[in-house]
From Swiss-Prot:
Low complexity: bias regions: 854-864
Classification lineage: Eukaryota, Fungi, Dikarya, Ascomycota, Saccharomycotina
Biological function: Ubiquitin carboxyl-terminal hydrolase that recognizes ubiquitin chains that stabilize FZO1 and promote mitochondrial fusion. UBP12 deubiquitylates FZO1 only after oligomerization.
Region (Disordered): 827-893, 1188-1207
PANTHER family, alphabetized: UBIQUITIN CARBOXYL-TERMINAL HYDROLASE (PTHR21646:SF24)
All residue ranges annotated as the DUSP domain in the record: 97-199
Single GO molecular function: cysteine-type deubiquitinase activity
Protein encoded by which gene: UBP12
Superkingdom field: Eukaryota
Organism annotation: Saccharomyces cerevisiae (strain ATCC 204508 / S288c) (Baker's yeast)
Biased composition (Acidic residues): 867-883, 1189-1198
Family: Belongs to the peptidase C19 family.
Protein name per UniProt: Ubiquitin carboxyl-terminal hydrolase 12
Residues recorded as bearing Phosphoserine in the entry: 84, 1160
Length: 1254
């Protein structure tokens, strides 16, 4: 048959028509195991051996036929063309002919195999893409086909785990075909033959490839569990094995026991008996989440879990020769149990024939997984609430899981919490360590998955964790499947807020609206309502609203004030000191308003700055500062020097100009900053008036210096300029001085030399990037220069003045010069006419050089005479004289003056300039001497009676302890809202600093009180460690609850306290909890649990208080719906436990040993009510028998019973020792002593039976 007769498609379909394969399911899928993920977790895939059936299918005739009919690849190719003597190694043969020959051989082998194939024949699985390429007519060169790569279709060769078919399609070919192709093309590195069998489809009766082998999980039934440390380095990972449906039960037993003893290599195979239980997958497993969970996750299972398995078959020797598909139709779980040969022991599967389930003690600790104490302490407080515990312990929550809630977590959080509760409180076997700590790893993993805050191992806040957990449980268990849209009820305009019925109706409507969207066990137990009242200070409008809560955050009435001494620089009085105390949460605006209130100044005229190194360091009005959002404690440090400047501004045309002070100290050439910077305000027309600028500065210095400096008085508003300023009129005869009257009014006619020794004015221009701009506010632009300015760039104010203005501003210098000339003339005895002539033009330059010399000589004489008396003063005068403009009466000079007057005036100050007042050392010392009562270095203290009274009150209250009542009173105390959280009044249509009061309208059954020990304001946090005295019992909330007619009562008892030790940087959480199982108090410190007294919880570490309502009507906690759920689920739980005991007794009758056969019925009856003392747990070995205590008649003198009748199960030993047939008198006896129909009638659970071999 040629290659054209058999297409690729025909060949591929021969072994690919498999219903089990095409339905898309695998044994892993049916067991609910994602084996792909399991395999991904392996360090490496085992590929050491070719995976075939564990036991060769015993079909010797078929194997012999296959072997005898198989020849080498070259022989098979050469047979149809013997004359050509074809050899694949010959390079001369054309590639196309070689490939066609190969295809012919493969097609012939396939056709021959069709005629002889039968069940059990081996087939090999290859990638479909390779197979199609081999038969592709377009491929003519064998080199293009390449080796067979089975790694792409098989993930685990040992366990026969194939890749997803949709991802990597594959098909099967007969083993001879695969051998032929692999001999020619070989296999890629790491690839192995993927061998399986042909099986008969039980439905269609046709042969098909066994793509899906039987898949088993292996479990170990043991009594020694519950989180104990595993000896010999064992882990709890499940073992998997795969078998062909054609394999025998013997093969399954051998492979299972080999894997088991390979894992449990510490056991001596000759020292133990064993049994293997076959657990089929039934519908119960799919519906029983508990069974499904431990089957999917645990290698070791407990006797209790074993009894809950739905279908159990004991594998006995009579089954060993049966094929697997004859005893089950689905892949299953295998459970192995062992029993030591020596000593008196019983099978773990018979555990409950001798032991009762013991109720949990309620004192199980939680292992710290790494900074998880915040979680452990909160969980201990939560799980010890009886109603919440029972709701999850008895699985009452299952019917209320809301997986459709978009705000929830599809029930994962609820299930994780339930699993935790059951691990802590479920009835347990006595063999288990009663108080062994439990690691809440799965719970933490679930919580961390849905909230990244709790995913790592950083310390977190216990209250934040608790709030998230309660909210998650609420949404996962919300009974409202579809939340309808609701609007929050509110009072109508005209409703009387003083009418109790109106207010109560609003509260009832709000609660009803809340329950339309929120109804769960959390709502039943933890949720109450606040009443919030807002009073508008302007229109007296009152707003009342109600809001739900699940915890009450109480402030602590402790000294948490921020205190600081602030300087105030009023405009028209000396500097002041004001001691301030405000709340640590206060803002800069609160401080500003407080300073204005206590000083009597308008807060809108106050500008705050921090001063450092004689200059402005921080401008609190600037948008670049943090004053807009930081608290005072974060904004202003204790060492900061804070000054509030009063700058009254009447209109937008006024400009605020910063002023710095410098002086040249002895031994220095350059001026250095000193004193305190300040500000002056100038009107727009004063910016070019040097006299006005100087007058403003002098007025400020008078107040800043304590009123000492005797600055000369200006002439004021005068019109007789010729009489007041004769020298100016004489120097500028053509100038109309009326236009300079605004400048002339600030000029002094006569000054002394001491005047110029105080300060000179310089102007320093600052770039915009060197400014701190003000915040967006009305009025002038308030700005401050940045620090580290280059003061050497400051220019003298004279350099910015035109000649006439300069002479007006420096008129005192003209007077000084004129007086100096007259004095010199008098000394030389000139004639009267000459004197008059010279005086009339004292600075006439003309052609008379003698006058210049006279003036010069006169100045030198004065300088010489004055130097001894006051050298510093002389230097200043000399410097000023040198800057005087030269007076002239030349026509060109007058023209120049006229031109300057008609030109645009030159601005002295611009918006980016600052004033630098340069003082002489002598002048600064004289003006700001230490003998002043008040000055800028020693401000006057402003009395603060309000602060003094507050300090006195705190001093008297130091000995008084803080109580929970104090906290509750402070909680309901009305407070005035700040500027940053003002309320929008609907009547005023404005944001108002309203008065707000929050009160408890009602309280829930579980009252969670959060003591606000942590104060966090953005970047700053602090902790309050003060002790709050809270009652252990009889907390009466009737004084603090508005709705006092609650029929449930308002008396509460403490049952738990969550503690925090340490500070914000690091700490530790613990819990005091009342255990309702024994009504004792315990201290839970992660895994350590000790008995304690509740009074020990009253300490500065108490953080969260849990109170439970004492119902006066006798009803239970929570809603009637919750009580009904708990009662029903508890009844179901009790029935389940009873069923377990019943099942155990049935199993015991089937499973008991020879020794147990001899135990009297009285001993078994003795165990129905109490654990029989003869089956005590003197060690961790259960089943040690001392019969004399239960039945004295059965005493033996030697105290030990012989083992003459023990029959042992020796299956595995025979395999290990001599590889002979498996058999055991013990298990065989079970089959012999229990007829087949009786075995089938042993109901264990839900009508499922133990089955005997067919």
């Amino acid at each position: 048959m040629g290659s054209s007769d058999v297409s690729s498609r025909e060949c591929s379909l021969v072994y690919n028509e498999d219903p089990d394969f095409t339905d898309g399911t695998t044994p892993c899928d049916r067991l609910g195991v994602d084996l792909m993920n399991v395999l991904d977790d392996k360090d490496e895939i085992k590929q050491e051996s070719v995976p075939v059936s564990d036991r060769e299918i015993e079909d010797t005739e078929s194997d012999a036929s296959a072997v005898s009919s198989f020849a080498s690849a070259n022989e098979l190719i050469a047979e149809p063309h013997a004359a050509s003597e074809t050899n694949l190694g010959t390079n001369g043969q054309d590639g196309r002919n070689v490939l066609e020959q190969q295809r012919d051989v493969v097609a012939r082998l396939i056709e021959e195999n069709k005629e002889t194939q039968k069940e059990g024949d081996k087939v090999c699985i290859v990638p479909k893409v390779w197979y199609d390429k081999f038969f592709d007519p377009d491929v003519t060169d064998p080199e293009d086909i390449g080796p067979i790569n089975t790694r792409m279709i098989c993930r685990d060769f040992e366990n026969f785990v194939l890749e997803d078919y949709n991802r990597c399609p594959y098909l099967s070919i007969a083993e001879p075909v695969f051998n032929f192709l692999s001999e020619i093309y070989g296999m890629t590195s790491g690839s192995y033959p993927v061998v399986t069998n042909l099986v008969i489809n039980q439905t269609t009766g046709e042969l098909e490839t066994e793509y899906n082998k039987w898949f088993f999980r292996l479990h170990y039934l043991t009594e020694k569990q519950d989180g104990r440390k595993r000896r010999h380095g064992q882990d709890d990972s499940i073992m998997y094995l795969s078998m062909s449906a054609l394999n025998l039960v013997r093969d399954l037993v051998e492979k299972s026991m080999n894997l088991f003893f390979e894992k449990a290599d510490h056991l001596d195979v000759n020292a133990v008996d064993f049994k293997i239980w076959f657990v089929s997958e039934g519908s119960d497993i799919a519906t029983d989440s508990n069974v499904s969970t431990f089957l999917n996750s645990s290698y070791e299972i407990t006797p209790l879990q074993f009894l809950e398995l739905p279908i159990k078959k004991l594998l006995i020797p009579d089954m060993f020769e049966n094929r697997l598909d004859k005893i089950t139709s689905n892949p299953s779980d295998l459970v192995i149990e062992i029993k030591p040969i020596e000593g008196n022991h019983h099978w773990p599967s018979n555990y409950f024939a001798y032991n009762k389930l013991e109720p949990a003690s309620g004192t199980t600790g939680l292992v710290n997984l790494g900074n998880t104490c915040y979680m452990n302490s909160a969980l201990q407080c939560l799980v010890h609430i009886p109603q919440l515990r029972d709701y999850f312990l008895y699985d009452g929550y299952e019917d209320e899981i809301n997986e459709e809630n978009p705000l929830g977590y599809h029930g994962y959080v609820a299930r994780a919490f339930s699993d935790l509760v059951q691990k802590l409180f479920q009835n347990r076997m006595s063999i288990m360590q009663r108080n062994a700590a439990f690691p809440p790893s799965m719970f933490k993993s679930t919580i961390g998955h849905f909230n990244s805050m709790f995913s790592g191992y950083m310390q977190q806040d216990s209250q934040e964790f608790l709030a998230f957990l309660l909210d998650s449980l609420h949404e996962d268990l919300n009974r409202i499947i579809k939340k309808e849209y609701t609007e929050k009820p509110s009072l109508s305009p005209g409703d009387d807020v003083n009418d109790w019925n109106v207010v109560k109706k609003l509260a009832d409507d709000t609660w009803e609206m809340h329950l339309k969207r929120n109804c769960s066990v959390i709502t039943d137990l933890f949720v109450g309502m606040y009443k919030s009242t807002l009073y508008c200070p302007e229109c007296q409008n009152v707003s009342i609203t109600f809001d739900p809560y699940n915890d009450v955050t109480l402030p602590l009435p402790v000294d948490t004030v921020w205190d600081k001494t602030i300087k105030i620089f009023p405009m028209n009085s000396p500097p002041l000191l004001l001691e301030v105390e405000l709340s640590k949460s206060s803002t800069y605006m609160d401080l500003k308003n407080y300073v204005g209130k206590m000083s009597g100044l308008d807060p809108n005229t106050l500008f705050g700055c921090e001063i450092f190194s004689n200059q402005i360091y921080v401008n609190y009005e600037s948008t670049e500062s943090n004053a807009q959002f930081l608290t005072l404690q974060e904004l202003i440090k204790p060492a900061d020097d804070v000054i509030f400047y009063e700058l009254p501004v009447t209109n937008d045309n006024e400009v605020i100009v910063p002023v710095l002070n410098t002086r040249i100290e002895k031994g220095y050439k350059n001026a250095m900053l000193f004193g305190v910077p300040f500000f002056i305000t100038l009107k727009e027309d004063e910016l070019n008036n040097p006299g006005a600028i100087r007058m403003k500065l002098q007025n400020r210095f008078v107040h800043l210096s304590g009123g000492y400096i005797p600055f000369p008085e200006p002439v004021g508003n005068r019109t007789d300029f010729a009489d007041a300023f004769p020298l100016l009129v004489e120097k500028y005869p053509d100038v109309e001085f009326e236009q300079y009257k605004d400048i002339l009014q600030y000029t002094s006619i006569k000054v002394t030399d001491k005047d110029k020794s105080f300060f000179s004015i310089k102007i320093l221009s600052v770039e915009k990037e060197q400014q701190f701009a003000s915040n967006n506010r009305t009025g002038p632009n308030f700005w401050t220069p940045i620090s580290q300015l280059n003061l050497d760039k400051a220019t003298d104010i004279d350099d910015k003045l035109e000649d006439v203005v300069k002479d007006i501003y420096n008129y005192s210098s003209l007077v000084d010069c004129a007086e100096g000339v007259l004095m010199q003339v008098d000394d030389e005895g000139d004639t009267e006419g000459s004197e008059a002539k010279n005086f009339s033009k004292p600075f006439q330059s003309g052609d008379d050089e003698e006058n210049k010399e006279t003036v010069t000589n006169n100045e030198n004489v004065n300088n010489t005479n004055d130097r001894d008396e006051d050298m510093e003063l002389t230097d200043d005068v000399e410097e000023d004289a040198s800057t005087e403009p030269e007076l002239t009466d030349k026509p060109e000079a007058l023209d120049k003056i006229k031109d300057s007057l008609t030109s645009t005036p030159f601005a002295i100050l611009s918006m980016n300039d600052i004033i630098v007042c340069e003082w002489s050392e002598l002048g600064s010392n004289e003006a700001f001497s230490d003998d002043k009562i008040y000055n800028w270095e020693n401000p006057a203290t402003l009395p603060n009676k309000e602060l003094e009274n507050a300090k006195l009150e705190r001093s008297n209250a130091k000995e008084r302890t803080i109580t929970l009542d104090d906290c509750l009173q402070l909680f309901s105390k009305p407070e005035i809202l700040g500027l940053t959280d003002s309320w929008y009044c609907p009547t005023c249509k404005e944001h108002r600093q309203a008065t707000k009061q929050i009160q408890l309208w009602n309280t829930p059954d579980i009252l969670l009180i959060h003591l606000k020990r942590f104060e966090s304001q953005r970047s700053f946090s602090d902790k309050i460690d003060a002790t709050v005295n809270f009652p252990i019992t009889d907390l009466d909330l009737s004084r603090y609850v508005v709705y006092k007619d609650d029929p449930r009562g308002l008396i509460y008892d403490l049952y738990a306290v969550d503690n925090h030790y340490g500070g914000l940087g690091g700490g530790h959480y613990t819990a005091y909890v009342k255990n309702f199982a024994d009504n004792k108090w315990y201290y839970f410190d992660d895994s350590r649990v000790t008995e304690t007294a509740p009074e020990n919880s009253i300490a500065g570490s108490a953080y969260l208080l849990f109170y439970i309502r004492r119902h006066k009507d006798g009803n239970g906690l929570g809603s009637s719906k919750l009580q009904e759920i708990i009662q029903k689920s508890r009844h179901g739980y009790d029935e389940r436990i009873k069923k377990i005991y019943d099942e155990q007794m049935k199993l015991y009758e089937f499973n008991k040993t020879d020794e147990e056969e001899d135990v009297s019925d009285d001993m078994i009856e003795c165990n129905e009510d109490v654990q029989a003392p003869e089956y005590s747990n003197r060690s961790l070995e259960v089943g040690h028998i001392e019969t004399q205590d239960c039945n004295d008649e059965d005493d033996n003198d030697d105290g030990e019973r012989t083992n003459s009748g023990r029959r042992k199960l020796r299956l595995l030993k025979k395999v290990y020792k001599n590889n002979s047939g498996l058999g055991s008198s013990s298990t065989s006896e079970i089959s012999e002593g229990c007829p087949e129909n009786e075995v089938a009638d042993l109901n264990l659970k839900n009508g499922v039976t133990l089955e005997s071999p067919e």
